[in-house]
Amino acid sequence: MSADTAVVRGAPAAGDETWIVACLCAQWCGICRAWHDAFRALAAEGLLPGARWLWVDIEQQADALGDFEPENFPVLAVQRGERLLYCATLPQQSANWRRMIEAVGALDEAQARRWAQTLGEHAPDLRVLRDDLPG
């Protein structure tokens, strides 16, 4: 599976259960820039088959992110369909990100509902974001 994605246009489709794994970062952040290749390598592993992997510069997509403002970078965000299941800063170590992505991917329906509820209503909807650094 390619880590590259196309620009998403318009409103998300109802009933879409596509996985989205995003790294929310900022172009000015040196840590984020250094993390880019490792994030792309994780995408190439196919941890969540069929998932869209996005590298998101929060300043370039501020309008789409609404009120969401991370306290630190980089942020791992994982969403399935309309449910954002995980959105938090993690140390930029591939093993940590891999374990979290695998854990989120293994959630059953009831667990996913509980995880999504803990994030609240101001969480971003990853379905409206685009990949800022393809490849």
Per-range role (PLM):
Residues 1-19:
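A short beta-strand-turn-helix
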Residues 24, 43, 48-64, 70-72, ...:
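Thiol-based oxidoreductase modules, predominantly thioredoxin-like and allied folds used
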Residues 33-47:
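Typically the conserved alpha-helix immediately C-terminal to a functionally engaged Cys/Sec
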Residues 29-32, 76:
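The canonical Cys-X-X-Cys-His
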